Amino acid sequence: MKVAISGGGTGGHVYPALALIRELKKIHPEAEFLYIGTEKGLEAGIVKREGIPFEAIEITGFKRSLSLENIKTVMRFLSGAKKSKQILRDFKPDVVIGTGGYVCGPVVYAAAKLKIPTLIHEQNSVAGLTNKFLSRYTDKVAICFEEVSDSFASEKIVFTGNPRASEVVGVDSEGALETYGLVSGKPTVLVFGGSRGARGVNEAVEAILPEWNNRDFQLLYVTGDVHYEKIKDSLAELNLGNHISVQPFIYDMPKILNAVTLVVSRAGATTLAELTALGVPSILIPSPYVTANHQENNARALEKNNAAIVITEAELKNTDLMATVDSILNDEAKLNGMKLSAKQMGRPDAAAKLVEAVLSIMK
């Protein structure tokens, strides 16, 4: 069995692809994989570190507005599709899967033209431009949010969820909090703004740290590498208690997510898949800097189901974040209700469901 996968630009497209590969390997340990991405995207480093064969093509994304740059992008797309055809002819995959990002455009398009079975995976509640385009050519479209179903032909849709969800379920959290100087068994809030951190989230948290010093519940505050030194210096005079741990980055996030009580974070699709799979309540602060405002749409889906409270970045300055945290952690009925609602939205079997969809289209 040979599988070619393409997706990139951000971790939100790459990590689901890797989760799918791992799940396929469980069922077909003899399977061969080829990952097609760009050398400039996040995927180049991540995929190579995983030891998965990697081929690169050159492609850039389309602008949503009319632009001369889009003419160049069309030329790059055609060139990328031509190279993709050659790569696919050489590898001879049984199926080609796209997990989003502009790089999978020419790859999945080329596969469809070569009559190779194809599937695309849309992680967000708003369809990406590339997936919208590719859906005309693919055999199946796997989705994670019901809200996005109107963007694709109904006969092609299969609701699988995000395969990253499966990778956090059942992870042993023993000693996870102790690694960061905290104590197991105490109510703990995790705050993070994505892999690089988020200035808006950091500013809101810094403003309430003096108040947090007087709370009983613990805080694991992840600033992001690029913000850490500056924030560390600014907090030096606060004399924070041992129940507050400030870190630049978390490398064992699945373990930590299994150990915390509440999460304050951005609303990327992968993060939400993990939170709902575990039934972790959240306060979501969607990034306003993403295509089609898809993070807010993702977050509103959880809010609608009482699994999260949403605060937009524009609302942060006029919102008492500490009071919002208090309102959840000091109300056991509310906390448990949000846990249950999040859990009901979760798809812990997402990886298996996606594999099932992939196998269903293979000749």
UniProtKB/Swiss-Prot annotation:
Annotated pathway: Cell wall biogenesis; peptidoglycan biosynthesis
Highest taxon above the source species: Bacteria
Any GO BP annotation: regulation of cell shape
Ligand binding (UDP-N-acetyl-alpha-D-glucosamine): T10, G11, G12, N124, S195, I250, Q295
Subcellular location: Cell membrane
Keywords: Cell cycle, Cell division, Cell membrane, Cell shape, Cell wall biogenesis/degradation, Glycosyltransferase, Membrane, Peptidoglycan synthesis, Transferase
InterPro entries in alphabetical order: GlcNAc_MurG, Glyco_trans_28_C, GlycoTrans_28_N
Catalytic activity: di-trans,octa-cis-undecaprenyl diphospho-N-acetyl-alpha-D-muramoyl-L-alanyl-D-glutamyl-meso-2,6-diaminopimeloyl-D-alanyl-D-alanine + UDP-N-acetyl-alpha-D-glucosamine = di-trans,octa-cis-undecaprenyl diphospho-[N-acetyl-alpha-D-glucosaminyl-(1->4)]-N-acetyl-alpha-D-muramoyl-L-alanyl-D-glutamyl-meso-2,6-diaminopimeloyl-D-alanyl-D-alanine + UDP + H(+)
Any one of the GO CC terms: plasma membrane
Primary location group: membrane
TM segment ranges: none
One Gene Ontology molecular-function label: UDP-N-acetyl-D-glucosamine:N-acetylmuramoyl-L-alanyl-D-glutamyl-meso-2,6-diaminopimelyl-D-alanyl-D-alanine-diphosphoundecaprenol 4-beta-N-acetylglucosaminlytransferase activity
Topology of this chain in the membrane: Peripheral membrane protein
The protein's Enzyme Commission number: 2.4.1.227
NCBIfam families: murG
Family: Belongs to the glycosyltransferase 28 family. MurG subfamily.
Functional note: Cell wall formation. Catalyzes the transfer of a GlcNAc subunit on undecaprenyl-pyrophosphoryl-MurNAc-pentapeptide (lipid intermediate I) to form undecaprenyl-pyrophosphoryl-MurNAc-(pentapeptide)GlcNAc (lipid intermediate II).
HAMAP family: MurG (MF_00033)
Annotated protein name in UniProt: UDP-N-acetylglucosamine--N-acetylmuramyl-(pentapeptide) pyrophosphoryl-undecaprenol N-acetylglucosamine transferase
Upper classification of the organism: Bacteria, Bacillati, Bacillota, Bacilli, Bacillales
